[in-house]
Regions:
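A conserved hydrophobic position in a structured secondary element of the catalytic/binding core
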Residues: 50, 107, 112, 181-183, ...
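Hydrophobic helical membrane-anchoring modules
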Residues: 200-202, 207-232
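N-terminal glycine-rich phosphate-binding loop and ensuing alpha1 helix
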Residues: 2-49
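Short active-site oxyanion
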Residues: 42-47, 130, 206-207
């Protein structure tokens, strides 16, 4: 079995400029994902998909490969991760590089480690599902969620759960925004991962942080330090 890790990292992040290579506790943010992928020992190649020369330079420095430059039409705010992975697989196949399994690993997942990737891959192989992705449990019952209308009035999405006990409600999970394993065939044929053909690898909340704002970035640093207390 040949395994490929693809790390998408475009240059045009807006809320945090240069997010993928921003300083994160002394190293570029993307370096954590590259090193975890390389040190996991499960990938034959770790490949960057980027449209940005500086990001490519940083990724090469930390051991990733960059055999192509991503097209600009796959580098805007509307390009999906699935389309980026499909593009990378097709380019590599045209170069006679064929892989059985492909993992899309986000550049913004510094809280992971090599052992998590190994365990997730083992579960992916064991389950024989089309995809396996990282998820985490919602910290509050989604059945009690509400919204505000145009007059700022409160409405529950479903009032029947107003008096339900938390322990009686079905647990709900969300995408952790970290990694997605899949067969090459599934990546090329499917356009939606969140279906019964997928399985999940549940992460504890201290290993999950969606880095979209400066506040998210600072919180991720705090979590990293807590998770690696002996190193600080």
């Amino acid at each position: 079995m040949k395994n490929l890790c693809i790390i998408p990292a475009r240059g045009g992040s807006k809320r945090i400029p240069r997010k993928n290579i921003i300083n994160f506790l002394g190293k570029p943010l993307i370096s954590y994902s590259i090193e975890n992928a390389l040190n996991s020992g499960i990938f034959d190649e770790v490949v960057l998909s980027s449209d940005d020369e500086e990001i490519i330079e940083v990724a090469l420095k930390y051991g990733a490969k960059a055999p192509f430059v991503r097209d600009k039409n796959l580098s805007d705010d509307y390009a999906s991760s699935t389309a980026v992975v499909q593009n990378a697989i097709e380019i590599l196949q045209s170069q006679n590089q064929i892989y059985d399994h492909v993992c899309c690993l986000y550049a913004t997942a510094p809280l992971l480690n090599k052992d998590i990737l190994k365990q997730a891959y083992e579960k992916f192989i064991q389950n024989q599902s089309k995809f396996l992705f990282a998820a985490t449990e919602f910290e509050y019952p989604i059945q009690r969620a509400f919204y505000l209308n145009e007059n700022n009035q409160v409405y529950m999405f479903d009032e029947k759960h107003y008096k339900s006990r938390s322990q009686d409600l079905t647990k709900a999970y969300h995408d952790a925004g970290a990694f997605y394993f899949g067969t090459s065939k599934a990546w090329l044929e499917e356009d939606f991962i969140f279906k019964p053909h997928s399985s999940v690898f549940v992460l504890p909340r201290n290993l999950v942080c969606d880095i979209d704002t400066i506040q998210d970035l600072e919180f991720a640093k705090i979590l990293y330090k807590v998770n690696h207390e002996s190193a600080f």
